[in-house]
């Protein structure tokens, strides 16, 4: 019974994060499932399975308030499909050669490396925004890429209000899909990438990522279940039940807060999960 309640509350919290910052809560859910004994590969696969219906609802809500760029979502989702398949292949190799302990170590070490890095950039950008009294700014890296990286074709993203090279957008999508399949995280890399590489506003980046997550989740779930049988549908249903409520609460919340708060919330949660995984590892 304790595990049931834990999974429901975990899903609720993950759903709120998904609707609020566009991440899908992937950096919270797999560690939570692993904390109650789920092997790393099953935690990754089950998270991906629950992701796409939740992401579909969140994307629809964000579309209604104009926070989803269809062109970014379409291009990145196409590349993400290939990234997902590559990620599943790598994860399957780790599982075959090192077993459940190897997948647990792989997932944990990836969290400990990537999460603090992304958190640093988010916090730095928030400090710069507040220092200059601006709610949300186009990051310096994105401005430089927009001016100097002009490898055609150049694509204009109307909702995001930026123009970037197709050859910058596609690798960003591939990397998002790869991480989503290997360590269950895509959104916490996808959202910062859309912000810091493509230059989209925070609310558009988080809303667009939900559309990408829907495509990644639906295609990735099929591959995980069909080829590796790694999806635990009981855990998936429990987490999804909580997430479907949480994602709507989180999506509504974005209309009432300043954009820099999305980055700050993302950074704080990432650091908390990093500390939790580090203590678990130790």
Identify the residue ranges that each predicted region occupies.
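Transmembrane helix boundary and interhelical junction motifs in multipass membrane proteins
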Residues: 21-29, 182-193
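A helix-boundary/kink motif common to multi-pass secondary transporters
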Residues: 22, 39, 69, 95, ...
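Juxtamembrane transmembrane-helix boundary motif
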Residues: 1-10, 64-175, 226-282
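Juxtamembrane transmembrane-helix termini in multi-pass membrane transport proteins
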Residues: 21, 26-73
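Structural signature of hydrophobic alpha-helical transmembrane segments
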Residues: 39-52, 210, 229-243
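Interfacial segments of multi-pass membrane proteins
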Residues: 29-42, 190-204, 223
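Transmembrane alpha-helix interface/packing and boundary motifs in multi-pass membrane proteins
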Residues: 10-22, 173-184
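Membrane-interface helix-cap regions at the ends of transmembrane helices
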Residues: 54-65, 215-231
């Amino acid at each position: 019974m304790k595990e049931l309640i834990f999974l429901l509350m975990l899903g609720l919290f993950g759903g709120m994060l998904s609707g609020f910052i566009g991440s899908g809560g992937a950096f919270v859910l797999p560690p939570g499932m692993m904390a109650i004994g789920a092997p790393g590969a099953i935690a990754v696969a089950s998270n991906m399975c629950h992701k796409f219906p939740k992401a579909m609802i969140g994307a629809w809500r964000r579309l209604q308030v104009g926070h989803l760029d269809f062109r970014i979502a379409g291009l990145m989702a196409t590349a993400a499909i290939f990234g997902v398949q590559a990620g599943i292949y790598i994860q399957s190799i780790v599982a075959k050669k090192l077993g459940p302990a190897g997948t647990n170590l792989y997932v944990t070490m990836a969290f400990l490396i990537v999460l603090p890095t992304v958190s640093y950039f988010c916090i730095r950008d928030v400090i710069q925004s507040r220092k200059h009294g601006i709610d949300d700014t186009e990051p310096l890296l994105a401005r430089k890429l927009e001016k100097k990286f002009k490898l055609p074709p150049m694509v204009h993203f109307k909702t995001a209000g930026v123009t970037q090279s197709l050859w910058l957008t596609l690798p960003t999508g591939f990397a998002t899909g790869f991480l989503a399949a290997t360590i269950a995280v895509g959104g916490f890399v996808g959202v910062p990438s859309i912000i810091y590489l493509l230059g989209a506003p925070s609310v558009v980046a988080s809303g667009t990522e939900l559309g990408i997550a829907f495509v990644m989740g639906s295609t990735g779930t099929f591959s995980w279940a069909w080829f590796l049988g790694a999806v635990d549908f009981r855990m998936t249903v429990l987490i999804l039940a909580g997430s479907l409520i949480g994602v709507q609460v989180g999506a509504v919340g974005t209309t009432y807060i300043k954009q820099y708060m999305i980055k700050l919330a993302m950074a704080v949660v990432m650091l908390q999960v990093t500390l939790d995984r580090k203590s678990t590892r130790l």
